[in-house]
From Swiss-Prot:
GO terms for biological process: translation. HAMAP family: Ribosomal_bL28. It comes from Cyanophora paradoxa. This is Large ribosomal subunit protein bL28c. The lineage of its organism: Eukaryota, Glaucocystophyceae, Cyanophoraceae, Cyanophora. Pfam families: Ribosomal_L28. It comes from the Eukaryota. It is found in: Plastid, Cyanelle. Keywords: Cyanelle, Plastid, Ribonucleoprotein, Ribosomal protein.
Amino acid sequence: MARQCELTGKKANNGYTVSHSHRRTKCLQKANLQTKRIWSPTLKRWLKLQVSTKVIKDLKRKSIDALLKI
């Protein structure tokens, strides 16, 4: 399974680690993903998804069905 949010598609970002002398080395900035069990009222079952923490925050305001339509 790829390290990617299953709802938003967020994934790792390529970036640089910059030292004090301004030497740059490549690094991979991974998305903050968590495995979460989410109840879907329309499907009437639990969904086990790997989602970003932003989605978890949005789930407190909206239902999973509203987020899936986006």
